[in-house]
């Protein structure tokens, strides 16, 4: 492995580490990573001098946000993604509601069925969208100035055979 790929490796390691920290730290309402699946899916691959960052599919939506069908969070205004005709399936929120310990009650004080709660959450997300967290974008952009000199030096050393 050349100096260029070593520098890319350091850069990619830093970005993934910071993205995982952002997921664990979360935001105003707690962790963005209740199950740990997204965090454990974050990785990178270096191939022919290019870095590819990998994650579960929904990582993109959590990072960039999704515009809602009726309204949009200010953080998600620039998102390329938007709910138009279909709601997210309510079943995907089942494990999340259990781990979150959410157990709301109706007007008579009875617990709402989990299936109904999952539907209400899915409908709210469909209407309002998903707030952009920038858990990956921020470390990706912040790391460039930190590692650009190392990456450039590594590239020049590997390709121009510079002697010091």
Where are the model-predicted features located?
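Charge-rich, low-complexity N-terminal segments
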Residues: 1-45
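Charged, low-complexity interaction tracts
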Residues: 37-164
